[in-house]
Design a protein with these regions (language model features):
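Short acidic/polar hinge/loop motifs at secondary-structure boundaries
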Residues: 130, 137-166
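Outer-membrane beta-barrel signature, preferentially recognizing the C-terminal barrel domain
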Residues: 280-298, 323, 416, 429-480, ...
Length: 650
């Protein structure tokens, strides 16, 4: 009854807020229609494919360059892509990138991977070979090299673009960028001036958000935002509620100051949430961050210094494990034009993770608290061998407390073909650094220890080879294709003791192998109102145990990945200032634990009522009332979601 009263109170508060907001929106709609004709949708929807190909990206070289000439397999999810989609959070928006595989396992939990290695819960292997950043702030957790998906929330209307690189990015971004880099870039505050309100309600998602931006003086602007949401529970394989619904409130700000040569950005966020558990208890999450970035733009060089603090606290039910991580990061970099044909970027930084873990009788870390200090220095040189041919070579040296100094080199050759196509080839090296979960964990059943960390655990390593092309053969067609081969060594395995007894088990590095495959996607502007965007990734994994491996749990312990996944996105601008966008996705069968292939569909119908008002009806997972994306007992039954939304700018 207490739980019921609490939930009813939550729904009453949100229903009142949503009703008030919808009343304001309907009033604004009536007055706007009385004043005149509705305005067109966002300008980006009117861009040609050629203009989209020249969107500036920064994640490939840590400096601004046109997407068409970037020598990497990079896909850009634009602001307009997100606004027109049915996505209600960042993981759902990432499904728009055909070079990513996003799997939902619970109401607040997602697995995000690129080019394989999405993890295998049977062996406690997590998706840990992908680096995710928000405005240059790493959101990966040092405890197990993965992410907490419940910390990825930003106001989707404030996202400028998401740059998704499939392939190694360690030379510029550091360890754990083994299979890819995701850089979520939010809009400058001068682009978000005025007031904005967003209200949404559906069978699974209820959300209310607001933002206000203004000018401080001639050179400075700011914005402040806040939102609160509730996401309903999924179902278990037995058809009962999974009790995994969750709620979260988040607020933040951003200020931007700029002159002809200098710019300064200061931004921060704070959040608090509650997550229900299968045993009907509650977990909590708290956190926040503060970031400052200064840039100086000179005639022949650019300089940047960035510092941030991040706090992430995850609490299980009363008496359960709690994870607290405080991150302190400082980074400097400089880009120098060393002559007409040479550009050098160099820099370095230091990061400190201060973590504390509340041990339980079944899960312990020894020691339970620790400070991890990581240092790095890098340099990369882009040399123009000819007017259309560039050679890029870089190397980063990174020092972490578990493995010491490690070199992370990268070499690329790119060829710009008449401005309409780019070809590139690359060879790179990256690692996944050891973590407390590898070195310091102790797992027990009663007094019996069945798993212990291994202080001799080594970094997982990959040497990656890639060749690709990006082209626009006609004004209405663009495409990108990349073929890759990744050679892995020292992959994590589960081992057992031989000399004395079978237990405790421990983590080893006795697996190696390779993956190879293709990423491909494109755009076809059928006419001035309809665009189709197909994409596919095919991956083949060939792994083997090294001599001396126990071979417990088999090769499948490394990953449980489909051999292929594909997307087809349709975007239509319809009469009367309406739009219809749909994204169909296919995910191949999982080998072990097994799961059949499936198709799913997300769609949104939007009406740009006026320059200030947008109404929409959207749905996710529309093909099935419920479906499984990860086999039980590790994945819940993901439920179909339908939602109505109203956005109001004033």
């Amino acid at each position: 009854m207490a739980r019921l009263r609490q939930e009813c109170g939550f729904w009453s508060r949100h229903a009142a807020r949503a009703l008030m907001t919808c009343s304001l929106l309907l009033g604004a709609l009536h007055s706007t229609l009385a004043r005149g004709e509705a305005a067109p949708a966002d300008d980006l929807a009117r861009m040609s494919l050629g203009e989209l190909a020249n969107i500036e990206v920064t994640s490939v070289s840590k400096s601004s360059e046109g997407l068409q000439r970037a020598p990497a397999a990079i896909y850009v999810i634009t602001h307009d892509d997100i606004q027109r989609s049915a996505a209600t959070n960042i993981p759902e928006a990432l499904r728009l990138a055909p070079n990513l595989l996003v799997t939902q396992t619970a109401s607040s939990a997602y697995v995000i991977s690129a080019r394989g290695f999405g993890g295998n819960p049977n062996a406690q292997n997590f998706a840990n070979k992908l680096l995710i950043l928000i405005d240059g702030r790493s959101v990966y957790t040092p405890l197990f090299s993965g992410i907490y998906a419940n910390t990825l929330d930003v106001m989707l209307q404030d996202v400028e673009r998401i740059e998704v690189i499939s392939g190694v990015g360690a030379t510029l971004w550091g360890a754990n960028a083994m299979n890819g880099v995701i850089n979520i870039i939010t809009r400058a505050s001068y682009l978000t001036q005025g007031s904005f309100v967003d209200a949404a309600a559906g069978n699974q998602v209820q959300e209310l958000g607001a933002r206000y931006g203004d000018r401080i003086n001639g050179d400075a602007t700011f914005r402040a935002y806040g939102f609160e949401f509730h996401r309903g529970a999924m179902e278990t394989a037995g058809g009962t509620t999974a009790h995994d619904g969750w709620s979260k409130g988040q607020g933040g700000f951003r200020t931007d100051w700029s002159t002809d040569r200098d710019s300064l950005t200061v931004q921060g966020d704070f959040y608090r949430g509650t997550e229900n558990m299968l045993d009907n208890s509650d977990g909590m999450l708290f956190g926040g961050n503060l970031l400052a970035r200064y840039q100086n733009h000179g005639a022949r060089s650019d300089f940047q210094v960035q510092a941030y603090f991040d706090q992430n606290e995850q609490f299980g039910p009363a008496g359960g494990t709690a994870f607290v991580v405080h991150t302190y990061d400082l980074e400097v970099q400089q880009t120098i034009a060393a002559g007409a044909s040479n550009r050098i970027i160099w820099g370095g930084g230091e990061r400190v993770y201060a973590y504390g873990i509340t041990n339980t009788a079944s899960l312990l870390f020894e020691p339970p608290s620790h400070d991890l200090t990581l240092g790095d220095a890098f340099i990369q040189d882009t040399l123009a061998l000819a007017s259309s041919v560039n050679f890029i070579f870089g190397i980063k040296y990174e020092d972490d407390p578990f493995s010491g100094w490690m070199p992370l080199p990268d070499a690329r050759l790119s060829w710009d073909i008449n401005g309409h196509a780019t070809m590139w080839a690359a060879a790179s090296r990256a690692i996944r650094s050891p973590t407390p979960f590898d070195d310091e964990v102790v797992e027990k059943v009663g007094p019996f220890t069945y798993l212990a960390g291994n202080t001799q655990f080594r970094p997982e390593q990959v040497t990656a080879y890639e060749i690709g092309t990006r082209a626009q053969p006609s004004p209405d067609v663009s495409l990108s294709v990349a073929a890759f081969c990744n050679v892995y060594d020292d992959l994590r395995t589960i081992e057992h003791r031989v000399a004395k007894s079978f237990f405790p088990l421990y983590w080893g590095n006795l697996m190696r192998g390779d993956t190879f495959g293709i990423d491909a996607w494109g755009n076809w502007q059928i006419n001035n109102w309809w665009r189709l965007s197909p994409g596919v990734t095919w991956v083949r994994e060939r792994l083997e145990f090294r001599a001396g491996a126990s071979q417990l749990l088999g090769i499948a312990q490394a990953a449980d990945d489909p051999s292929s996944h594909a997307t087809l996105t349709s975007s239509m601008n319809l009469p009367h200032h309406t739009s219809f966008d749909a994204s169909l996705r296919y995910v191949g069968a999982l080998p072990e634990p097994g799961l059949q292939h499936y198709y799913e569909l997300d769609a949104r119908y939007g009406w740009q009522v006026s320059e200030k008002v947008n109404l929409s009806l959207s749905g996710t997972n529309l093909l099935h009332e419920r479906h499984t994306e990860l086999p039980a007992p590790f994945g819940e039954q993901i439920t179909r979601s339908v939602m109505a939304e109203a956005r109001w700018k004033f």
